[in-house]
Amino acid sequence: EFAGVMCGIMDQFASAHGKVDHAIYLNCDTLEYDLVPVKLDGIKVVVTNTHSPHKLDSGSFNDRVRQCQLAVEQINSVRPIQYLAELSQVDFDQVKDAITDETAHRRARHVVGEVQRTKDAVEALKNGDIVKFGQLMNQSHVSLRDDYEVTGPQLDALAEAAWKIINLP
């Protein structure tokens, strides 16, 4: 309802609540958030545009919402949950076999992993561990590419080029 189409809220939330030199740690269910200081101390950040088309009305977002809902429904056959984000990685490992749809399984694996990566990223930022934060961002990209399937060839090429510059596999 914020943007007039089915979409997430993060872009709009960041525009409304962002603060210089801070990351936003947002609970999309409750809209509770925390501003986490980001200390880059000599680190250069490159922001670029892939010029990839992005269409909120293409149905892909809604497909992923439905796939995640299917995963929740199937998990509910063995453990009651409302959201995938409720599951820790250990919890997910215990219930993942209930997800019989392979696509829904990959989407759920991404969501559960991304929630943990986000928690770990907040801790890394609070501790000033920018190397750990970068590793988590790289893991996030791989999961978005392989499990959530939303990156695209242009973004993948940029990530791979960056990884080569800093000697990552």
Locations of regions flagged by a protein language model:
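Short, glycine/acidic-enriched loop or turn micro-motifs at the edges of active sites
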Residues: 14
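C-terminal nucleotide
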Residues: 17-169
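Acyl-CoA/ACP chain-elongation machinery
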Residues: 1-7, 144
